[in-house]
Amino acid sequence: MAVTINTLREYKQKGEAFSALTSYDATFAQVVSEAGVDVILIGDSLGMVLQGHDSTLPVTMDQMVYHTSCVARGNKGALIMADMPFMSYGTVADALDNAAELMRAGAHMVKLEGTDWMKDTIEALSERGVPVCAHLGLTPQFVNKFGGYKVQGRDEKAAEAMIEHACELEAAGADLILLECVPAPLAARITQAVKAPVIGIGAGSDTDGQVLVLHDMLGVTTGRKPRFVKNFLAETDSIPEAIAAYAQAVKARTFPAEEHTFKA
């Protein structure tokens, strides 16, 4: 049975964790979905892991549409979420046009990075039938504003602001919240504060779901490994087995463990 946003809501209500993983092509989309992963994210992370850039900023709408269409052809029942790349949703009009392209390519949901300035955009998309995931915390498209890739929400003022933003974006129509590089206690507070399912990456084990970049969890990413990453291929004999092990570990809440978590 195909995973939908209602499936994720039911998981949250039952306290069952769900898994998400990036994919960028038809072959991996099939492998990931058949391994039991609930959500496939076509991330603008492709700019780094596929194209070799040092950020996600160079990724274009045409590239996101292309990879979304590839994933949609290979997918076997996972919910497909596509990133809207840098400045593709700077205005409501741009967001509507570009989200339509991704939905036509096969996405079931789009993901936007930002805070309360996105309320009008999320409301406009939601009213027109486009499900939205709001990405808070470390938002890679803002790397130049942050001065690097850093944990967000470490002081109480920033934490309270993030909780407020999550509630405001849910009220505007966000169906899903994604928290990246957020202290685990704050992620737990946000997960409890909103009715929408919350996906974490580097946000502890108390969120409703977990997401990783495919290349990271297979141990093939070069350079510095983020703290929240685990190499599942190192413990298995094949890529499909590694992906299935990841999905099972998320479901059992054995991943992320303490060593993958930011406490403060």
UniProtKB/Swiss-Prot annotation:
Mg(2+) binds at residues 44, 83, 113. The active site is at residue 180. Pfam families: Pantoate_transf. Its cofactor is Mg(2+). The keyword GTP-binding does not apply. Pathway: Cofactor biosynthesis; (R)-pantothenate biosynthesis; (R)-pantoate from 3-methyl-2-oxobutanoate: step 1/2. It is an enzyme of class 2 (transferase). One of its GO terms (cellular component) is cytoplasm. Keywords: Cytoplasm, Magnesium, Metal-binding, Pantothenate biosynthesis, Transferase. Binds 1 Mg(2+) ion per subunit. GO terms for biological process: pantothenate biosynthetic process. Belongs to the PanB family. Homodecamer; pentamer of dimers. This is 3-methyl-2-oxobutanoate hydroxymethyltransferase. The lineage of its organism: Bacteria, Pseudomonadati, Pseudomonadota, Gammaproteobacteria, Pseudomonadales. The gene is panB.
